[in-house]
Amino acid sequence: AWSATIPHTLGNPLYHWTHLELKRCFGIDTLLSPNTAEQIWEQANEKLKQDDCSACGLLDRFKVKTLCTTDDPATGTEFHQLIAKNSQVQTKVFPTYRPDRAWGVEDATNFIDWVSRLEEISEIRISDLNDYLEALAKRVNHFHSIGSRLSDHAFLQCFAEFPSEEKARNIFQKSSDGKNANPEEAAQFGSFILLYLCKLYRAKNWTMQIHLGALRNNSSRLMNCFGADAGGDSIGDLPQANKMSAFLNKLEE
C-alpha cells in the first residue's frame, strides 16, 4: 500500500524520508513504486541479514550515543537494565516516562486494568488516591535510578481544569468503582495528576516533553484489527494556547 502511495507524495517530507532511509540504511537508490516494491523488498531483506543492519549495527553505523524509548510506567524496564550490562552495546538506552493512561478515568474498565498493572509493578496496594500517587512516584524514582531524565506526554489539548484534592479523590474512586468519569471530571483528574507529576519531574531536574493536538484512533476498523497506536492517528485542529498558558501559569503558583 505504501509503495502505491509514495509516488503521489512528491514534495512531501515523507517522500524524501522514505528514500533517505532506503539509501542510508540499505544503500538502495531505486525510487519506491508498485513496480519496484518487490525488488526493494528483496534487497532490503538481504541487507537485514548482515550484522551492520542489525539493531546494534545500525546504532553503531549512525553513531547513536543515546537512545530513549517511551515507556508506560506500568511496564517493566528489564531490557533497559540488560542492555546497560552488555558491554558490546555502545549506545546508552534509557526509558522515558510516558504515563498517558494515568488519567484515563473516562474509561473505567481500562483504567482499572492499568491501575492493576501499576499496582503489580510498583508493589504498592492501590486502594485510594494517596496509594495511586505513591505508586506513580515510585515508578518515577525507579526510572530515574536507571538513567531516565525525560517524561513524554500527548494530549489532544492540555489539561487546564484544576480541582481540589478531594474532588480528584472522588473521581479516582468513581472510576475505580467501575463508573466512567464524564468529560469534565476526566479533564479535572488529568490536571491534578499532571500537576503532581510535574512537581516530581522538577524535583529530579527532568525534561518534560509535551505533544499537543494528536487526534487518536480515527479509524474504528484499524482500531478493531490492530489496537491503538497502529497508524490511525492524525493532527487535530483544536486551539491550544489558552489552556497551555493556564497550565504553565498554574505550575508557577
What are the residue ranges of the model-derived segments?
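Metal-cofactor-binding active-site regions of metalloenzymes
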Residues: 1-204, 253
